[in-house]
Amino acid sequence: MEKITSRENAKVKYACRLASSGAFRRAEGRFLAEGRKLCPELCRGAELETLFCTESALEKCPELSELSGEHYLVEDHVADKLADVGTHQGVFGVFRTPVHTLEEVKTGGRYLALERVQDPGNVGTLLRSAAAFGFDGVLLSDGCASVFAPKTLRASMGAAVRVPVMEVGAMPAAIAALRAKNITCLAAALYQSQPLSAARPGYPGGVCVVIGSEGQGLTEETIAACSGTVRIPMTCLLYTSPSPRDQRGS
């Protein structure tokens, strides 16, 4: 296995740029992930092109050598450059980004849609929840945190490739596309909403729950595009994040 000793190595610099720039990730169709558990987990739904690992990491996890792609040993100071956080596990992978579109949405499916959810941790947690509940896909509007940014990947714990993620641009147009397939779209908002428990239990055409940004909630255009609005009643006033709300109901 070839060993990289310089922080200025071209492959290392390329990987670092993937981690730091969303525009570069989109242009290249690739992303960088790190972690002894996360990298193998991502291999379940994304193609691993390049694996970087330190000697100590390989000694602890020899099964890493069985992963696909090109493998490189890196010295600790090189791993420090690749790392997004100060304490790392010495394992990094460059993956091809899975691409999914609205054409894959199917009648009868269950979907989650996020509009302008900006915190990477929140996006990652919602992806993980969608995967855990067996959702068929997640739609992300413009303004959402990048799914394949390092912080989002850590929060999603591999869910970013276990559930199809579709970047849809403007949410009202995406909702129109779903409703054209007989999918009921429910906006999570306070204004003129009904409790989630009172919503009709069966949606034979499928259902999509639409959640808005942490601070502003859903846009009026998105709420108007949906089939209805719902809320989750709370027994006391607690701060939750993300907490979708419509400004008119504040």
Identify the residue ranges that each predicted region occupies:
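Boundary-proximal intrinsically disordered activation/regulatory segments immediately upstream
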Residues: 1-55
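Short, structured coil segments at secondary-structure junctions
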Residues: 67, 156, 161, 225-226
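Short beta->alpha connector loops at strand-helix junctions that form conserved
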Residues: 74-75, 115, 141-142, 164, ...
